[in-house]
Protein backbone atom coordinates (compact mmCIF):
# COMPACT_ATOMS: atom_id res chain seq x y z
CA UNK A 1 0.00 0.00 0.00
CA UNK A 2 1.26 3.49 -0.86
CA UNK A 3 1.63 5.66 2.28
CA UNK A 4 -1.00 8.41 2.46
CA UNK A 5 1.64 11.16 2.66
CA UNK A 6 3.39 9.86 -0.45
CA UNK A 7 0.07 9.49 -2.29
CA UNK A 8 -0.84 13.10 -1.52
CA UNK A 9 2.56 14.32 -2.72
CA UNK A 10 2.23 12.40 -5.96
CA UNK A 11 -1.29 13.73 -6.46
CA UNK A 12 -0.07 17.30 -6.04
CA UNK A 13 2.64 16.59 -8.60
CA UNK A 14 0.13 15.18 -11.05
CA UNK A 15 -2.16 18.18 -10.66
CA UNK A 16 0.79 20.51 -11.16
CA UNK A 17 1.78 18.68 -14.33
CA UNK A 18 -1.78 18.92 -15.63
CA UNK A 19 -1.71 22.71 -15.26
CA UNK A 20 1.66 23.13 -16.97
CA UNK A 21 0.41 24.50 -20.32
CA UNK A 22 -1.34 27.40 -18.58
CA UNK A 23 1.60 27.93 -16.26
CA UNK A 24 4.06 28.05 -19.15
CA UNK A 25 2.02 30.69 -20.97
CA UNK A 26 2.21 32.94 -17.89
CA UNK A 27 5.73 32.08 -16.74
CA UNK A 28 8.41 34.79 -16.74
CA UNK A 29 10.98 31.99 -16.94
CA UNK A 30 11.74 29.32 -19.54
CA UNK A 31 9.81 26.18 -18.60
CA UNK A 32 10.51 24.37 -21.87
CA UNK A 33 12.24 20.98 -21.65
CA UNK A 34 15.17 21.96 -23.88
CA UNK A 35 16.53 24.67 -21.54
CA UNK A 36 18.88 26.36 -24.05
CA UNK A 37 19.79 29.03 -21.50
CA UNK A 38 20.98 26.60 -18.84
CA UNK A 39 24.42 27.51 -17.50
CA UNK A 40 27.05 24.78 -17.97
CA UNK A 41 30.47 24.29 -16.40
CA UNK A 42 33.77 22.71 -17.36
CA UNK A 43 35.22 19.74 -15.51
CA UNK A 44 36.85 20.70 -12.21
CA UNK A 45 40.02 18.58 -11.77
CA UNK A 46 40.34 19.47 -8.09
CA UNK A 47 36.76 18.44 -7.32
CA UNK A 48 37.14 15.24 -9.33
CA UNK A 49 40.30 14.39 -7.41
CA UNK A 50 38.43 14.93 -4.13
CA UNK A 51 35.99 12.10 -4.87
CA UNK A 52 37.24 9.08 -2.87
CA UNK A 53 38.78 6.43 -5.11
CA UNK A 54 36.52 3.77 -3.68
CA UNK A 55 33.31 5.77 -4.05
CA UNK A 56 30.68 3.99 -6.13
CA UNK A 57 28.08 6.13 -7.85
CA UNK A 58 24.60 4.66 -8.22
CA UNK A 59 25.33 4.46 -11.94
CA UNK A 60 28.94 4.65 -13.18
CA UNK A 61 29.70 7.95 -14.89
CA UNK A 62 26.43 9.49 -13.73
CA UNK A 63 25.46 11.74 -10.82
CA UNK A 64 22.05 10.51 -9.68
CA UNK A 65 20.20 13.25 -7.84
CA UNK A 66 16.90 13.00 -6.01
CA UNK A 67 14.77 16.10 -6.51
CA UNK A 68 11.22 17.12 -5.63
CA UNK A 69 9.26 19.19 -8.22
CA UNK A 70 7.57 21.40 -5.65
CA UNK A 71 7.07 24.43 -7.88
CA UNK A 72 8.85 27.20 -9.79
CA UNK A 73 11.35 28.72 -9.71
CA UNK A 74 13.22 26.11 -7.64
CA UNK A 75 11.99 22.88 -9.23
CA UNK A 76 9.01 22.13 -11.43
CA UNK A 77 8.00 20.05 -14.43
CA UNK A 78 8.63 21.49 -17.88
CA UNK A 79 5.92 21.91 -20.48
CA UNK A 80 6.34 18.26 -21.53
CA UNK A 81 5.16 17.26 -18.03
CA UNK A 82 8.17 14.99 -17.48
CA UNK A 83 11.41 17.00 -17.64
CA UNK A 84 12.39 18.63 -14.34
CA UNK A 85 13.55 22.26 -14.63
CA UNK A 86 14.34 25.14 -12.31
CA UNK A 87 17.10 26.61 -10.19
CA UNK A 88 17.89 23.39 -8.33
CA UNK A 89 18.11 21.30 -11.54
CA UNK A 90 20.41 23.96 -13.00
CA UNK A 91 22.66 23.78 -9.95
CA UNK A 92 22.66 19.99 -10.09
CA UNK A 93 23.81 20.21 -13.71
CA UNK A 94 26.68 22.50 -12.73
CA UNK A 95 27.80 20.02 -10.06
CA UNK A 96 27.59 17.08 -12.47
CA UNK A 97 29.57 19.02 -15.07
CA UNK A 98 32.21 19.90 -12.48
CA UNK A 99 32.63 16.23 -11.54
CA UNK A 100 32.82 15.15 -15.18
CA UNK A 101 29.57 13.19 -14.89
CA UNK A 102 26.27 12.99 -16.71
CA UNK A 103 23.23 14.05 -14.69
CA UNK A 104 20.22 11.90 -13.87
CA UNK A 105 17.47 13.75 -12.01
CA UNK A 106 15.06 11.42 -10.22
CA UNK A 107 11.76 13.08 -9.19
CA UNK A 108 10.52 12.19 -5.72
CA UNK A 109 8.00 13.22 -3.10
CA UNK A 110 9.88 15.59 -0.80
CA UNK A 111 9.02 13.62 2.34
CA UNK A 112 10.63 10.52 0.81
CA UNK A 113 14.14 11.91 0.26
CA UNK A 114 15.67 10.64 3.55
CA UNK A 115 14.73 7.01 2.93
CA UNK A 116 15.69 7.19 -0.74
CA UNK A 117 19.09 8.62 0.09
CA UNK A 118 19.93 6.23 2.93
CA UNK A 119 18.81 3.23 0.87
CA UNK A 120 21.21 4.16 -1.94
CA UNK A 121 18.74 5.23 -4.62
CA UNK A 122 20.55 8.53 -5.13
CA UNK A 123 24.10 9.82 -4.84
CA UNK A 124 22.77 13.11 -3.51
CA UNK A 125 19.60 15.08 -2.94
CA UNK A 126 19.39 18.66 -4.24
CA UNK A 127 15.92 19.73 -3.28
CA UNK A 128 15.74 22.69 -0.91
CA UNK A 129 16.85 20.63 2.10
CA UNK A 130 17.76 22.78 5.09
CA UNK A 131 20.63 21.99 7.42
CA UNK A 132 19.48 21.01 10.92
CA UNK A 133 21.35 19.46 13.81
CA UNK A 134 18.98 16.50 13.75
CA UNK A 135 19.56 15.82 10.05
CA UNK A 136 23.33 16.08 10.51
CA UNK A 137 23.18 12.88 12.57
CA UNK A 138 22.38 10.91 9.40
CA UNK A 139 23.48 13.10 6.49
CA UNK A 140 26.36 15.25 5.25
CA UNK A 141 25.74 18.71 3.83
CA UNK A 142 27.40 21.05 1.31
CA UNK A 143 25.64 24.40 1.47
CA UNK A 144 24.58 26.13 -1.76
CA UNK A 145 21.76 28.57 -0.94
CA UNK A 146 20.38 30.65 1.91
CA UNK A 147 17.01 29.65 3.28
CA UNK A 148 15.01 32.86 3.03
CA UNK A 149 11.46 34.03 3.52
CA UNK A 150 10.30 37.07 1.60
CA UNK A 151 8.34 40.16 2.60
CA UNK A 152 6.21 41.21 -0.39
CA UNK A 153 3.64 44.00 -0.71
CA UNK A 154 1.33 45.34 -3.41
CA UNK A 155 3.21 47.19 -6.13
CA UNK A 156 1.71 50.52 -5.05
CA UNK A 157 2.22 49.97 -1.31
CA UNK A 158 3.67 52.75 0.82
CA UNK A 159 5.56 50.14 2.85
CA UNK A 160 9.04 50.19 1.34
CA UNK A 161 11.36 48.17 3.58
CA UNK A 162 11.34 45.57 6.35
CA UNK A 163 14.74 44.63 7.73
CA UNK A 164 14.13 44.22 11.46
CA UNK A 165 11.25 43.94 13.96
CA UNK A 166 10.72 47.69 14.42
CA UNK A 167 10.10 48.08 10.66
CA UNK A 168 7.11 45.72 11.00
CA UNK A 169 5.48 47.46 13.97
CA UNK A 170 1.77 48.08 13.42
CA UNK A 171 1.65 46.28 10.07
CA UNK A 172 -0.64 43.39 9.19
CA UNK A 173 0.71 40.17 7.65
CA UNK A 174 -0.78 37.18 5.88
CA UNK A 175 1.12 34.08 6.89
CA UNK A 176 0.68 30.32 6.94
CA UNK A 177 -0.60 28.98 10.25
CA UNK A 178 1.85 26.78 12.13
CA UNK A 179 4.77 27.81 9.91
CA UNK A 180 8.22 29.00 10.80
CA UNK A 181 7.21 32.42 9.50
CA UNK A 182 4.43 32.60 12.08
CA UNK A 183 6.85 31.63 14.87
CA UNK A 184 9.30 34.36 13.86
CA UNK A 185 6.70 37.11 13.45
CA UNK A 186 5.15 36.32 16.83
CA UNK A 187 8.59 36.80 18.39
CA UNK A 188 9.03 40.06 16.48
CA UNK A 189 5.69 41.26 17.81
CA UNK A 190 6.73 40.44 21.40
CA UNK A 191 9.96 42.37 20.95
CA UNK A 192 8.10 45.38 19.59
CA UNK A 193 5.63 45.43 22.47
CA UNK A 194 8.49 45.16 24.96
CA UNK A 195 10.12 48.15 23.26
CA UNK A 196 6.93 50.21 23.43
CA UNK A 197 6.09 49.76 19.74
CA UNK A 198 2.90 48.49 18.16
CA UNK A 199 2.47 44.71 17.79
CA UNK A 200 2.21 42.93 14.46
CA UNK A 201 -1.20 41.75 13.29
CA UNK A 202 -1.07 38.22 11.88
CA UNK A 203 -3.81 36.76 9.70
CA UNK A 204 -3.35 33.02 9.25
CA UNK A 205 -4.17 31.18 6.02
CA UNK A 206 -3.70 27.55 5.03
CA UNK A 207 -2.82 28.12 1.39
CA UNK A 208 -0.87 30.51 -0.79
CA UNK A 209 -3.85 31.61 -2.87
CA UNK A 210 -5.72 32.82 0.20
CA UNK A 211 -2.67 34.71 1.47
CA UNK A 212 -2.31 36.50 -1.86
CA UNK A 213 -6.02 37.31 -2.05
CA UNK A 214 -5.75 38.92 1.38
CA UNK A 215 -2.82 41.04 0.20
CA UNK A 216 -4.34 42.07 -3.11
CA UNK A 217 -7.68 42.80 -1.48
CA UNK A 218 -6.10 45.16 1.04
CA UNK A 219 -6.87 43.01 4.10
CA UNK A 220 -3.18 42.86 4.99
CA UNK A 221 -0.14 45.01 4.31
CA UNK A 222 2.43 42.26 3.74
CA UNK A 223 2.54 38.61 2.68
CA UNK A 224 5.29 36.40 4.11
CA UNK A 225 6.28 32.99 2.77
CA UNK A 226 9.31 31.25 1.19
CA UNK A 227 11.19 33.81 -0.87
CA UNK A 228 11.59 31.92 -4.15
CA UNK A 229 7.85 31.26 -4.49
CA UNK A 230 7.08 34.95 -4.19
CA UNK A 231 9.84 35.88 -6.64
CA UNK A 232 8.10 33.76 -9.26
CA UNK A 233 4.66 35.21 -8.51
CA UNK A 234 5.96 38.79 -8.57
CA UNK A 235 7.69 38.27 -11.92
CA UNK A 236 4.62 36.58 -13.38
CA UNK A 237 1.85 38.87 -12.12
CA UNK A 238 3.78 42.14 -11.74
CA UNK A 239 1.41 43.40 -9.03
CA UNK A 240 3.51 42.64 -5.95
CA UNK A 241 7.08 43.57 -5.03
CA UNK A 242 9.76 42.52 -2.56
CA UNK A 243 10.59 44.86 0.31
CA UNK A 244 12.80 42.56 2.35
CA UNK A 245 13.96 39.07 3.19
CA UNK A 246 14.19 37.10 6.41
CA UNK A 247 16.33 34.12 7.37
CA UNK A 248 14.14 31.05 7.63
CA UNK A 249 15.94 30.26 10.88
CA UNK A 250 15.87 33.76 12.38
CA UNK A 251 17.72 34.82 14.45
CA UNK A 252 20.06 32.13 13.12
CA UNK A 253 21.25 31.69 9.55
CA UNK A 254 19.38 29.02 7.59
CA UNK A 255 21.42 27.05 5.06
CA UNK A 256 20.11 24.96 2.17
CA UNK A 257 22.47 22.21 1.13
CA UNK A 258 23.33 19.33 -1.17
CA UNK A 259 22.57 16.31 0.98
CA UNK A 260 24.52 13.04 0.94
CA UNK A 261 24.69 9.92 3.10
CA UNK A 262 26.67 10.42 6.29
CA UNK A 263 30.24 9.31 5.77
CA UNK A 264 29.81 8.46 2.09
CA UNK A 265 32.88 10.56 1.31
CA UNK A 266 31.30 12.67 -1.42
CA UNK A 267 30.69 15.80 0.63
CA UNK A 268 34.18 17.32 0.32
CA UNK A 269 34.13 17.07 -3.48
CA UNK A 270 30.69 18.70 -3.60
CA UNK A 271 31.73 21.58 -1.35
CA UNK A 272 34.90 22.12 -3.37
CA UNK A 273 32.99 22.05 -6.66
CA UNK A 274 30.43 24.54 -5.33
CA UNK A 275 33.10 26.98 -4.16
CA UNK A 276 34.86 26.83 -7.52
CA UNK A 277 31.53 27.50 -9.25
CA UNK A 278 31.04 30.50 -6.96
CA UNK A 279 34.50 31.83 -7.86
CA UNK A 280 33.91 31.33 -11.58
CA UNK A 281 30.64 33.29 -11.50
CA UNK A 282 28.61 30.45 -12.99
CA UNK A 283 26.89 29.75 -9.69
CA UNK A 284 25.43 33.25 -9.45
CA UNK A 285 24.53 33.21 -13.16
CA UNK A 286 22.47 30.08 -12.55
CA UNK A 287 20.61 31.66 -9.64
CA UNK A 288 20.04 34.89 -11.57
CA UNK A 289 18.45 32.92 -14.40
CA UNK A 290 15.62 32.10 -11.98
CA UNK A 291 15.55 35.43 -10.12
CA UNK A 292 16.89 34.20 -6.79
CA UNK A 293 20.28 35.92 -6.53
CA UNK A 294 19.24 37.07 -3.03
CA UNK A 295 19.68 33.46 -1.90
CA UNK A 296 23.33 33.19 -2.99
CA UNK A 297 25.93 32.12 -0.44
CA UNK A 298 29.38 33.72 -0.30
CA UNK A 299 30.99 30.30 0.06
CA UNK A 300 29.91 26.69 0.47
CA UNK A 301 30.47 25.03 3.82
CA UNK A 302 30.62 21.38 4.83
CA UNK A 303 28.30 20.51 7.72
CA UNK A 304 27.94 24.02 9.22
CA UNK A 305 25.97 24.57 12.44
CA UNK A 306 22.40 23.53 11.72
CA UNK A 307 19.10 24.84 13.00
CA UNK A 308 17.94 23.39 16.32
CA UNK A 309 14.53 21.91 16.98
CA UNK A 310 11.90 24.52 17.81
Give short role names for the model-derived ranges.
Residues 4-8:
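N-terminal export leaders
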Residues 30-47, 180-195, 242, 275-310:
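Ligand-binding clefts/hinges and TM-proximal coupling segments of bilobed small-molecule sensing domains
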Residues 30-128, 289:
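Extracytoplasmic small-molecule ligand-binding "clamshell" domains
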Residues 78-79, 93-99, 181-204, 234-238:
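Ligand-binding cleft/hinge of the Venus flytrap
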Residues 94-98, 106-107, 111-124, 138-139, ...:
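Short helices/loops that flank or line small-molecule/ion binding pockets
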Residues 112-115, 129-136, 184-193, 217-252:
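A ligand-binding cleft/hinge motif common to bilobed small-molecule-binding domains
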Residues 146-153, 235-272, 292-310:
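Periplasmic-binding protein-like
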Residues 155-173:
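Flexible hinge/capping segments at coil-to-helix
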Amino acid sequence: MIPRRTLLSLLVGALSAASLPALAQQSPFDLGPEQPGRIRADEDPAAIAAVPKGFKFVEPGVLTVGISPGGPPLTTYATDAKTVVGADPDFAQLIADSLGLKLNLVPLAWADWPLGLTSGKYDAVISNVGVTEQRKEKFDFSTYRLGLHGFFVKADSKVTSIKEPKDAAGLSFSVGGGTNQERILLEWSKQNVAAGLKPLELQLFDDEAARLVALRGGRVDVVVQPHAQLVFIAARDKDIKRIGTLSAGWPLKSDVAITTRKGSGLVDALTLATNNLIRSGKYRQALARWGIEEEAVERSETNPPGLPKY
